[in-house]
Design a protein with these regions (language model features):
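Glycine-rich SAM-binding Motif I of class I
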Residues: 50-54
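Short alpha-helix at the nucleotide-sugar/activated-sugar donor binding site of glycosyltransferases
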Residues: 46, 57
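Accessory, often C-terminal, charged low-complexity segments
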Residues: 1-3, 25-39, 59-168
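Active-site nucleophile and cofactor-binding loops and adjacent substrate-binding regions
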Residues: 21, 47-48
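Conserved class I S-adenosyl-L-methionine
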Residues: 40-45
């Protein structure tokens, strides 16, 4: 029930405000048992409090979570650290004999490279500084972004003889 999941969140984060609509770990576990096998990928594109990722991790599934709000910092990252460290004793931990382990990577997406100006023309986003622009162009053109310490014009490379220089 929703009450169960709120209690799970209070155990994990006694000092912070409860998340508005957490899902109980047992519900997510049941859905995953019916639809996935260990090692499968689970995607939660509205991660919220991180329940799906926590359950997937405890059940030996690989997972991707996406969250645009601050929940990443207030709930998801601290929660997953507790799962990995074996400090999360609630939810399905006992049922799946979870002891801790594993890890995760956190990525922060950059703003969109292009935006429309007031006339509707596509222009480089003002949020990009020259280094960010060079990195984005390297990525788009298949170069490795690796600015040289000795040559200003070598911001990236694709081979030993192919270099890229991006100017603004």
């Amino acid at each position: 029930s929703n009450r169960t999941s709120k209690n799970e969140m209070r155990e994990l984060f006694p000092e912070s405000a409860s998340f508005g609509t957490p899902k109980p770990e047992r519900l997510i576990e049941r859905i995953m048992r019916l639809s996935t096998d260990p090692g499968d990928w689970v995607l939660d594109s509205f991660a919220g409090s991180g329940t799906t990722g926590a359950v997937a991790h405890k059940m030996g599934r690989r997972w991707i979570m996406v969250e645009l709000g601050e929940h990443c910092h207030t709930h998801i990252i601290p929660r997953l650290k507790k799962v990995i460290d074996g400090e999360d004793k609630g939810g399905i931990t006992e049922a799946v004999d979870w002891k801790g382990g594993g890890g995760f990577r956190y990525y922060h997406l950059a703003p969109s490279l292009l935006e429309k100006d007031k006339w509707g023309n596509w222009v480089i986003n003002k949020a990009y500084n020259p280094a960010m622009l060079a990195q984005a162009v390297c990525k788009l053109e298949g170069f490795v972004y690796a600015p040289s310490d000795t040559s200003y014009w070598q911001q990236g490379h694709s081979t030993e003889r192919d270099f890229i220089y991006v100017t603004t």
